[in-house]
């Protein structure tokens, strides 16, 4: 099996809905992904931990590969 390229191991995540009124764990997941403001986009490593945070708050995010 060939090693994957580092550029392919990034996921683009954009916060499209506010965290106001959300449960504390979901706000923590958004912060853990490095998102602070609406429409802010970050690139995170494709790891199981980041995938779990993205799945938990997927209703707040737009995700691109």
Swiss-Prot record:
One of its GO terms (cellular component) is cytosolic large ribosomal subunit. GO terms for molecular function: structural constituent of ribosome. Keywords: Ribonucleoprotein, Ribosomal protein. It holds the Pfam family Ribosomal_L30. Transmembrane segments: none annotated. One of its GO terms (biological process) is translation. HAMAP family: Ribosomal_uL30_B. Belongs to the universal ribosomal protein uL30 family. Part of the 50S ribosomal subunit. This is Large ribosomal subunit protein uL30. The gene is rpmD.
């Amino acid at each position: 099996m060939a090693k994957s390229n580092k550029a392919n191991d990034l996921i683009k995540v954009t916060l499209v809905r506010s965290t106001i009124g959300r449960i504390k764990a979901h706000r923590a997941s958004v912060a853990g992904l490095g998102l602070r403001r609406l429409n802010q986009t970050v690139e995170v490593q494709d790891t199981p931990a980041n995938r779990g945070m993205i799945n938990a708050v997927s209703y707040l995010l737009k995700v691109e590969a």
